[in-house]
Amino acid sequence: MRHNQMCCETPPTVTVYVKSGSNRSHQPKKPITLKRPICKDNWQAFEKNTHNNNKSKRPKGPCLVIQRQDMTAFFKLFDDDLIQDFLWMDCCCKIADKYLLAMTFVYFKRAKFTISEHTRINFFIALYLANTVEEDEEETKYEIFPWALGKNWRKLFPNFLKLRDQLWDRIDYRAIVSRRCCEEVMAIAPTHYIWQRERSVHHSGAVRNYNRDEVQLPRGPSATPVDCSLCGKKRRYVRLGLSSSSSLSSHTAGVTEKHSQDSYNSLSMDIIGDPSQAYTGSEVVNDHQSNKGKKTNFLKKDKSMEWFTGSEE
């Protein structure tokens, strides 16, 4: 998939204001009385009060100051082959659509993650928390476990949930992210491919499917996406929101009608941050070492990063 971008000037710092619902309480209106100033001093005082009133109308409450390096570090997470393949498997964007990914970024900011804490495991923890907050379908988010924890995910997922709770505590339990906040985050680099992950209407809403015989969740990296009768095969490959250089998108596309049982090479999972939170012996799985020489850097084709890598004026 090609991702074209128009060159545009973007400031190195963006401030996103978040309105608080508590500020919208209804208060009785005071009667307005107009008094004509009787002297010059009174007129100057009147102008000063008017200026102060205009200042008070500016947005109040918490805000996010987004630096260029913050967005760059977040986008670099999607260089990870495993995360790319996870997005490819989520072909219907039910686990990681653009709004859930924007919430993940906001969690990173609220938690004040350093650049070194922009890691794979923290990405999956934040994404799981976003699904917990927003999604009615509980079982779908469990697909994150085998991708984040590897083949031993059944033993490791209790610790994963503890890390989720620690992240929730670190953001002061402010897990709600408004739609406007998400859209302002996406507007910083609107043509980046992760913001093209639009979920279809038929996958939205609080509609449960009680027929659990069709798909057993979670399925993990060793399986291919399930055919979706609602999205259709064409939609599944056109709107993945994934770089065309992903090895899975090119290798597995030809065998999508069968479930691949190829073994994946286990890798040690990097957890950068608090060493006390690191897993011991946990594994993640992928099948990319055989294609290592064939992979290309998708950022060379994705021009949406140009304003991040360019020199600041």
From Swiss-Prot:
One of its GO terms (molecular function) is protein kinase activator activity. It comes from the Eukaryota. Regulates the G1/S phase transition of the cell cycle by binding and activating CDK1 and CDK2. Contributes to CDK2 activation without promoting CDK2 phosphorylation, by inducing a conformation change of the CDK2 T-loop that obstructs the substrate-binding cleft prior to kinase activation. Mediates cell survival during the DNA damage process through activation of CDK2. Residues 68-200 are annotated as: Speedy/Ringo box. InterPro entries: Speedy, Speedy-Ringo_regulator. It comes from Homo sapiens (Human). This is Speedy protein A. Belongs to the Speedy/Ringo family. It is found in: Nucleus. Residues 278-313 are annotated as: Disordered. GO terms for cellular component: chromosome, telomeric region; nuclear envelope; nucleoplasm; nucleus; XY body.
